């Protein structure tokens, strides 16, 4: 079977990656992220209607009233929990609720900005801790430059996913942050599979250049990469299309992340390691 020379395309891939990162960073800079209630603070309402109310119609009616930053959930007890972000015209919510008949306000709570600020710090700390752990693990298992290659691919994926949320102005909440961390782990797993095969082939194959070894290794793991990515992508796409608003919002991170992560494990991580090895003129990679 003919081998695909992936790494011959790395300069074009660098251009694609640079464009993705540039667009993402510009959007994050000028549009920002649509942070959810978990990060901004707001007000929580729990109401119970006398008659049965469809959650989809309720969500659409609230949105039509000009309230954009909100979440709505239906409980097992038949009540609706509505969370509205700070700065939204909450005074319109009462008028919306009246359209669905008589209702009882069970509770109303304020989520303070202090709590939200703490959540932001925890989210950033979780991401930085994950990045540090990955760098340490790969640096010990392979070489520091390999670890940096994986981190570069990981940063590429996270920035692109965040950029996609910024461009579409989808809400970023704690569930989305968790999804991004899962996507990060998925991306690293893909990269480690390729790196492992490269290390194995470096020991077995003699008389080949590093680029040839890398291309061979990527081709050998290609079927596994494609099957794993397609399986995950089909599942994520199904839930993204058929799931409700909250689930669709989370699955958006998986859809974008799986596509970008598969691409980066080949064209970012491996390409970076190859060019760094060439830069320092190291013919072989010393493995742990």
Swiss-Prot record:
Q: Where does it live in the cell?
A: Cell inner membrane
UniProt keywords, alphabetically: Cell inner membrane, Cell membrane, Membrane, Protein transport, Translocation, Transmembrane, Transmembrane helix, Transport
Question: In the record, what terms sit under GO molecular function?
Answer: protein-transporting ATPase activity
KW 4Fe-4S (keyword) present: no
> Which Pfam families does the entry link to?
Sec_GG, SecD_SecF_C
Q: Which residues form a coiled coil?
A: none
For the keyword Cytoplasm, the answer is no
Query: What are its GO biological-process terms?
Result: intracellular protein transmembrane transport; protein targeting; protein transport; protein transport by the Sec complex
Major subcellular site: membrane
Q: Which residue ranges does UniProt annotate as crossing the membrane?
A: 13-33, 123-143, 145-165, 175-195, 226-248, 252-274
Q: Name one GO cellular component term.
A: plasma membrane
How is this protein positioned relative to the membrane?
Multi-pass membrane protein
Subunit description: Forms a complex with SecD. Part of the essential Sec protein translocation apparatus which comprises SecA, SecYEG and auxiliary proteins SecDF. Other proteins may also be involved.
Q: Which family does it belong to?
A: Belongs to the SecD/SecF family. SecF subfamily.
Protein's job: Part of the Sec protein translocase complex. Interacts with the SecYEG preprotein conducting channel. SecDF uses the proton motive force (PMF) to complete protein translocation after the ATP-dependent function of SecA.
Q: Which HAMAP family match?
A: SecF_B
Question: What name does UniProt use for this protein?
Answer: Protein translocase subunit SecF
**What gene is this protein translated from?**
secF
């Amino acid at each position: 079977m003919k081998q695909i020379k992936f790494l011959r395309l790395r300069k074009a891939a660098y251009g694609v990656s640079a464009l993705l990162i540039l667009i993402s960073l510009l959007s994050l800079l000028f549009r920002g992220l649509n942070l959810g209630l978990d990060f901004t603070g707001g007000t929580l309402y729990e109401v119970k209607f006398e008659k049965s109310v469809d959650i989809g119609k309720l969500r659409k009616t609230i949105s039509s009233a000009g309230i954009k930053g909100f979440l709505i959930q239906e409980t097992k007890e038949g009540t609706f929990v509505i969370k509205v972000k700070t700065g939204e015209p909450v005074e319109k919510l009462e008028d919306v609720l009246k359209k669905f008949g008589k209702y009882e306000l069970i509770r109303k709570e304020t989520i303070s900005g202090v709590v939200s600020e703490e959540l932001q710090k925890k989210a950033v700390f979780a991401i930085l801790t994950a990045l540090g752990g990955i760098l340490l693990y790969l640096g010990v298992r392979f070489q520091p430059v390999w670890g940096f290659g994986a981190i570069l691919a990981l940063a590429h994926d996270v920035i692109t996913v965040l950029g996609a949320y910024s461009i579409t102005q989808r809400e970023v909440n704690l569930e989305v942050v968790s999804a991004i961390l899962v996507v990060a782990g998925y991306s690293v797993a893909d990269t480690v599979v390729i790196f492992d095969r490269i290390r194995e082939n470096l020991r077995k194959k003699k008389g080949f250049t590093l680029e040839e070894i890398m291309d061979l290794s990527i081709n050998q793991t290609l079927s596994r990469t494609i099957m794993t990515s397609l399986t995950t992508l089909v599942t994520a796409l199904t839930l993204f299309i058929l799931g409700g608003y909250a689930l669709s919002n989370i699955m958006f991170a998986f859809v974008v992340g799986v596509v970008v992560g598969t691409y980066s494990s080949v064209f970012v991580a491996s390409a970076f390691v190859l060019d760094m090895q060439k830069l320092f003129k190291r013919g072989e990679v010393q493995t742990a």
